[in-house]
């Protein structure tokens, strides 16, 4: 690695460190409602979806409670333990803000709430530039009509179309739209893996120094965004709970709290991976900011990036290996969907890290045994 590249990386690392000093602004305190619980229930009964459900299930039982985060009245209509309809009422105006039926009652993530996954990463002024950096950074301007460039577009545009409808709560459209890009990428991976002749791979037109600096800045930005404005979905929450159970020598399965009853669906390895982070940032017992989940996701992400860099150096010797490692690290750091997983604080990068470690260990029998 030459002197210019080292200086550029040092400057980029300094800028990235400044970005990580961002912090989140605390939410405002919840005010007393002007609309009473009984009044909110009566308003909810007049909602068209509640009326239609009552016609089908005459014995529906309403139950109202305030959401601790938003302060809104959530009026559920139950038949037994099954919530058929949920109507959300503004506690100050009495206006019906939302009403849900079907799977969108139980699964809030399917409602299309802004930022439900990753919060600010979904903002167009962040998401679109990140997509542009990913595509333009890996583009070979000298040969624009390569199939590899179509791969890049499928990642950002193919999945992006599905995500557009998902973010708006239109799951019936979003899910079918996810299949074409998945099938395309699966077919491409099989073709690349089984063809006899090796390809030339991606040959970005940008200098490797630019990609190296961009990688460091992107990593710093991803971490800063995670610290400042990211949320922990049920996946990360489950990991922290499982780690807490293991550390306390309690059963994992069938022993999860009411707000994450189905969180014990993973294998024990997923929970063990969270143990060091839960010990460093002990679980409070509630679904709060969960710093252990943030720390785990950041570690999985950074370890994957480092592993990809080492993998590039393993695949090729000398300077070419370093350049390939930087290219692989840049591709991960610039990909909007790896950032999407990080800002949702999932365990997705743990799977990627496992695959990268497996590839690194393939050339050594001892390493393969340790990895297993």
Specify the residue positions occupied by each region the protein language model found:
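Short, non-transmembrane alpha-helical segments in secretory-pathway proteins
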Residues: 31-67, 118-127
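Hydrophobic alpha-helical segments
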Residues: 113-144
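Multi-pass membrane glycosyltransferase architecture that uses lipid-linked
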Residues: 138-372
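Bacterial N-terminal signal peptides
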Residues: 12-24
């Amino acid at each position: 690695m030459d002197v210019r590249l080292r200086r550029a990386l040092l400057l980029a690392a300094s800028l990235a460190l400044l970005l990580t000093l961002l912090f989140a602004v605390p939410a405002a305190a919840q005010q007393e409602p002007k609309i009473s619980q009984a009044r909110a229930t009566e308003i909810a009964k007049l909602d068209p979806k509640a009326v239609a459900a009552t016609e089908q299930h005459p014995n529906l039982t309403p139950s109202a409670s305030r959401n601790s985060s938003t302060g809104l009245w959530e009026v559920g209509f139950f038949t037994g333990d099954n919530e058929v309809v949920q109507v959300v009422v503004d506690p100050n105006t009495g206006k019906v803000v939302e009403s849900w039926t079907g799977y969108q009652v139980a699964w809030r993530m399917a409602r299309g709430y802004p930022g439900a996954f990753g919060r600010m990463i979904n903002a167009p002024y962040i998401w679109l530039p990140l997509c542009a950096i990913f595509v333009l950074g890996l583009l070979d301007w000298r040969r624009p009509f390569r199939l590899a460039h179509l791969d890049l577009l499928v990642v950002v545009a193919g999945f992006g179309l599905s995500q557009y409808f998902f973010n708006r709560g239109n799951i019936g459209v979003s899910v079918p739209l996810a299949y074409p890009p998945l099938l395309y990428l699966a077919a491409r991976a099989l073709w690349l893996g089984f063809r006899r002749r090796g390809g030339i791979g991606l040959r970005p037109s940008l200098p490797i120094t630019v990609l190296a600096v961009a990688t460091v800045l992107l990593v710093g930005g991803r971490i800063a965004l995670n610290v400042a404005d990211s949320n922990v979905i049920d996946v990360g929450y489950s990991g922290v709970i499982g780690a807490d159970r293991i550390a306390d020598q309690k059963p994992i399965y069938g022993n999860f709290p009411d707000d994450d009853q189905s969180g014990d669906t993973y294998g024990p390895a997923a929970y063990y991976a969270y143990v060091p982070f839960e010990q460093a940032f002990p679980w409070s017992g509630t679904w709060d900011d969960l710093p252990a989940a943030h720390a785990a996701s950041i570690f999985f992400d950074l370890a994957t990036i480092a592993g990809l860099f080492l993998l590039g150096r393993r695949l090729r010797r000398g300077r070419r290996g370093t350049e390939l490692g930087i290219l692989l690290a840049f591709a991960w750091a610039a990909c909007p969907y790896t950032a999407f997983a990080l800002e949702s604080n999932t365990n997705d990068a743990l799977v990627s890290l496992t695959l990268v470690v497996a590839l690194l260990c393939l050339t050594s029998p001892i390493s393969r045994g340790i990895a297993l």
